[in-house]
């Protein structure tokens, strides 16, 4: 599985997931008005969202 770890004007960066990590995730945490901290990567289980953010998980490449 290949997950996106970052996006920028120059394109996307990806990582190959380790054995046992079969889910890609994207997690947004609200830092202020229209300002979010975004993290992406591979995981074994979908992380939980906190009260200021949300999480999207998938099992497909490059999402």
From Swiss-Prot:
Coiled coil: none annotated. Disulfide bonds join 3-24, 17-42, 46-57. One of its GO terms (cellular component) is extracellular region. Pfam families: Toxin_cobra-type. It comes from the Eukaryota. InterPro entries: Snake_3FTx, Snake_toxin-like_sf, Snake_toxin_con_site, Toxin_cobra-type. Keywords: Disulfide bond, Secreted, Toxin. Expressed by the venom gland. GO terms for molecular function: toxin activity. The keyword Secreted applies. It is found in: Secreted. This protein shows a synergetic toxic effect in that it enhances the toxicity of other toxins. Heterodimer of C9S3 chain 1 and chain 2 (AC P01409); disulfide-linked. Belongs to the three-finger toxin family. Short-chain subfamily. Aminergic toxin sub-subfamily. This is Synergistic-type venom protein C9S3, chain 1. It comes from Dendroaspis angusticeps. The lineage of its organism: Eukaryota, Metazoa, Chordata, Craniata, Vertebrata.
